[in-house]
Amino acid sequence: MGMQCNTKLLLPVALIPVVIILIGTLVPILLHEQKKAFYWRLFLQSQHVEAPITVTQGDTVYLDASNNPCNYSSFWYHGNCELCGWNGYLRNVTHYYTNTSCSPQFMCINETKGLQLYNVTLNDSGAYTEHVYECDLSCNITTYNEYEILNYFDNCNYTINSTKHIITVVSSRHSKQTNSHVSTHAGWAAAVVTVIMIYVLIHFNVPATLRHKLRTRNNVNRIA
């Protein structure tokens, strides 16, 4: 009888470590899947956005990365030329790759995964598109070794978000002409408003002045 009781007690005790191991294994997986689902909904809110921008020749333009939770899956393109992206051949995988063969003068911002265009010319007008790829990466990449990260980046092949910045570069002369036109229109508007105000003042004040003169003349005649 005593042996049967001990056996019944040992079975739940033996199951406790198994339950703890299962919980320790399943909870991180469930949390990770929940986080992925949240980011997926976040990305879909701004999928395929177009943002028009007008700048003057010689300006510097900063293009921020869109909502990308860990900033490890953004790639920038100008036409068919990849400006910024991840280079699998770099030993330090936390740095952005800059493709110097592309025509605009630009710099890839490693900290924000954004793009900076400097000293823009008229030829730099066009679409600059940021593609965000789905990568099964945690926010802390130090948990992966180099080869694991490169394998993950090789599998980042599904675009879930893209932002197209349509940049129009205008010449400084055009900008000055525009400012001149704005100033001219503002001057004409001020002149018209002034004329209207003078007309209103004259219209209301002249009859009042005449009435005052007539009243004064009548008073003089009565006294006489």
UniProtKB/Swiss-Prot annotation:
Domain of life: Viruses
Glycosylation, residue list: N71, N92, N99, N110, N119, N123, N140, N157, N161
Primary location: virion
InterPro entries found in the cross-reference section: Ig-like_fold
Topology of the protein relative to the lipid bilayer: Single-pass membrane protein
Membrane-spanning parts: 186-206
Assigned GO CC terms: membrane; viral envelope; virion membrane
Signal peptide positions on this chain: 1-25
Keyword Transmembrane helix: yes
Location(s), subcellular: Virion membrane
Record's keyword terms, sorted: Glycoprotein, Late protein, Membrane, Signal, Transmembrane, Transmembrane helix, Viral envelope protein, Virion
Presence of keyword Metal-binding: no
Family of the protein in this entry: Belongs to the RL11 family.
Annotated protein name in UniProt: Glycoprotein UL1
